[in-house]
Amino acid sequence: MFAIALLSFLVVLINAHPPMHAEMHSAVVTLANEIDTNYLTSPAKIKIVAPLESALIPGGETYQLRCDIMSTPAATIHWKFNGKLIQGSNELNVEEKLLNFGKAIVDTGIVASILTIQCPSAENSGTYSCVGYNGHQTIETVAEVEIEGEASGCRSNHKSAPEIVFWTDSRFEMTGNVATLVCRANQQVDWVWMSNDELVKNNDKFTVLSNGDLVIKNIVWDDMGTYTCIARNQFGEARQETFLYPTAKKSSF
């Protein structure tokens, strides 16, 4: 109980004073790993679904890199350009671990992320890396992107529709547990979630967080299906779908 109390305290500090300091992040990871070791129903593992591919693209032509990672427990994704962080983070979802504490957990699925290179020019040529991290292991896939020619006539993207850059593609979790469906955008947006063409409303079971994530408590078999995350602003919207699969309940360890 001391470990869970300390983890709860660290989570409060993290949420109150982001970004997370290295020492605090290390402490959270250590305690989260202890929870995983005691309650995960399968060993930790992580895999790149499809590696990035190197590309030669014309200057000024918007280009997207996509990265999908299968993992237990669920992974985070961040992107690097020539070794420097440019998008995402490696902060784990410790809040869900707290909500499921003391229960057997599956915490398995696929997360996806896209990195958009807007109006690229020669300075955008280089090494792009997608890095997946599940608290136990780190995995990386790399692409060399070369920009050929100059960019011209590029428009500012300050007044543009949002883009969903990180989301849960699929998630397996045990019935009776909490499951988080992740959805993050590249700018401040209004969030909407749909299920079976119906609006998901905040209540005792469903909570849409300010960062876009959907938290579903006490999942049951009837919760299985496709959920649609929608990010909106005054210039348009973006959508991504995720599939939730509740698994048969097992006894706590």
From Swiss-Prot:
The keyword rRNA processing does not apply. Disruption phenotype: At the L1 larval stage, display defects in the positioning of the ventral nerve cord (VNC) axons characterized by axons of embryonically generated PVQ and PVP neurons, but not of RMEV, HSN and AVK neurons, from the left and right VNC drifting into the opposite cord (axon flip-over). These defects are not enhanced in a zig-3 (tm924) mutant background or in zig-3 (tm924) dig-1 (ky188), zig-3 (tm924) sax-7 (nj48) or zig-3 (tm924) egl-15 (n484) mutant background. In a zig-1, zig-2, zig-3 or zig-5 or zig-8 mutant background, cell body positioning of ASI and ASH head neurons is normal. InterPro entries: Ig-like_dom, Ig-like_dom_sf, Ig-like_fold, Ig_I-set, Ig_sub, Ig_sub2, Neural/epithelial_adhesion. It is found in: Secreted. Expressed in PVT, ASK, BAG, M2 and ASI neurons. In L1 larvae, expressed in pharyngeal ectoderm and mesoderm. Its main location: secreted. The keyword Transcription regulation does not apply. It holds the Pfam family I-set. Residues 1-16 form the signal peptide. Residues 43-146, 162-245 form the Ig-like C2-type domain. GO terms for cellular component: extracellular region. Keywords: Disulfide bond, Immunoglobulin domain, Repeat, Secreted, Signal. Disulfide bonds join 67-130, 183-229. GO terms for biological process: neuron development. PROSITE patterns: IG_LIKE (PS50835). PANTHER family: CTX-RELATED TYPE I TRANSMEMBRANE PROTEIN, DPR-INTERACTING PROTEIN ETA, ISOFORM B-RELATED. Required for maintaining axon position of PVQ and PVP neurons postembryonically in the ventral nerve cord (VNC) by preventing axons drifting into the opposite side of the VNC that could occur during body growth and movement. This is Zwei Ig domain protein zig-4.
